[in-house]
Design a protein with these regions (language model features):
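Catalytic toxin/effector domains delivered as secreted proteins or via bacterial secretion systems
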Residues: 13-216
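Extracellular, luminal, or virion-exposed ectodomains of exported proteins
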Residues: 2-17
Length: 216
């Protein structure tokens, strides 16, 4: 598939059609997300990476806010896609938001859906420890919850992930917007969908937040 994506002699439409056909033939669709339409793709990079026409401001409607002490954190979160991502939706009492409310450019795939409970009690303290690179403090929090400590390699991963998050916020929202603990708001309309879901962009990925006992 990657060879086809990297082939500049094929149009974007041809390459997307190939991806969709390969997806339909795939039996195990776990965490596979493929484009719904070639019209949603800005370009295909030389290495075959798909660059979508994502809306501005990390996909938030105007009115997004920085997560902080006064934020009502969700009891549950979910997302479509692998655990390396850091964009989530809360889960309302009435049930999860629809694919259209999330305004995603992919074919809907239930095998790519994941949901977690969210531990808000120590969330801010854990993110602050990562922010300050206070690994003793972080490990103290983890120990208080019966979780394994983070080692040197994990500390490096946490630092890089957090720095990447801050860089993304600066690039996509602006250097004057401070959101050390994440951003929350509603999903902007995009890809032919109205959006409207309650969205959370967190400093760490799902996988890292699982490690820290934030998601479980």
């Amino acid at each position: 598939m990657q060879t086809v994506l990297e082939n500049p002699e094929l149009s974007v439409e041809q390459r997307v059609q190939y991806i969709q056909q390969a997806y339909e033939r795939t039996k195990d669709k776990t965490d596979i997300l493929v484009p719904r339409s070639a019209a949603d793709i800005e370009k295909i990079e030389e290495d075959g990476t798909l660059k979508y026409k994502w809306p501005k401001f990390l996909g938030f409607n105007p009115g997004y806010t920085a997560i902080g002490e006064g934020t009502a954190l969700p009891a549950q979160m979910d997302r479509y896609g692998h655990a390396g991502g850091n964009n989530f939706c809360s889960i309302p009492e009435a049930g999860a938001y629809t694919f259209l409310q999330r305004a995603l450019p992919y074919l809907e795939n239930s095998a790519a859906y994941h949901a977690w409970s969210f531990n808000g009690d120590t969330y801010l303290a854990k993110i602050e420890a990562v922010r300050q690179q206070d690994w003793n403090g972080l490990n103290g929090l983890l120990a208080s919850e019966g979780l394994a400590p983070v080692g040197e390699a994990e500390c490096i991963r946490l630092t890089k992930a957090y720095e990447n998050y801050l860089r993304t916020v600066r690039e996509k929202i602006g250097a004057d917007f401070s959101a050390p603990y994440g951003v929350t708001g509603t999903v902007a309309s995009a890809f032919g969908s109205d959006g409207g879901a309650d969205q959370w962009t967190m400093p760490l990925s799902a996988a890292l937040m699982e490690k820290l006992g934030i998601l479980y």
